[in-house]
């Protein structure tokens, strides 16, 4: 199940707004496969990774790109607690993400099929190029089996187990732009459809 949503998640980049310049913005190929993303030069992967976050965060963020072995490798240490990667789910567009340490822990737990995330504080992650999620029978689901891929606009996330009953927040995408994804599961988190590139 985790292999379908890594970090949320969330999501293959729609690259819906390629004309808007972001930190390190250098448009990648639309529809690039994960294999093609991993084959990109260090410069191009870095530009793609940094395009996930607002400029003031991206300029001091750490960077991890795919090496020759296909694994993420750190090429720049973070000076502000955030780390950016060039793609997450890639269905089929690159969906770069910039995340803090709490989200990195959340991601690790998800990948390791942990029963619940172990981050002790809410985590913040940015996806300024947007992403996607799986929907089945009108609901956002974690598994891609039998589900359709739905594109998402630029957004940011708060990785914390928000409870819909307690917060009264929606549990599906809606005009307000805010909802709890995976509500009812330990990996529930808040989605905010707001372009991180416009945040200062």
Where are the predicted features?
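Boundary at the C-terminal end of the N-terminal hydrophobic targeting segment
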Residues: 19-25
């Amino acid at each position: 199940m985790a292999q379908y949503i890594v970090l949320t998640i969330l999501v293959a980049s729609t690259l819906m707004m390629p004309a808007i310049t972001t930190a390190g913005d250098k448009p990648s190929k639309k529809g690039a496969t994960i294999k093609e993303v991993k084959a990109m030069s260090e410069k191009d992967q870095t530009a793609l990774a940094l395009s996930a976050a607002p400029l003031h965060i991206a300029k001091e963020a750490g960077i991890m790109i795919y090496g020759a072995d296909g694994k993420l490798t750190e090429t720049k240490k973070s000076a502000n607690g955030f780390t950016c990667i060039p793609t997450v789910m890639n269905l089929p567009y690159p969906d770069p993400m910039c995340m803090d340490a709490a989200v990195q822990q959340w991601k690790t737990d998800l990948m390791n099929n942990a029963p619940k995330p172990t981050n002790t504080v809410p985590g913040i992650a940015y996806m300024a190029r947007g992403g996607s999620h799986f929907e089945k029978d009108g609901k956002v689901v974690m598994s891609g089996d039998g589900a359709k891929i739905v594109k998402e606009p630029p957004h940011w996330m708060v990785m914390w187990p928000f409870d819909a009953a307690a917060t009264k927040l929606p549990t599906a995408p809606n005009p307000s732009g805010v909802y709890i994804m995976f509500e009812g599961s330990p990996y529930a988190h808040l989605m905010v459809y707001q372009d991180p590139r416009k945040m200062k």
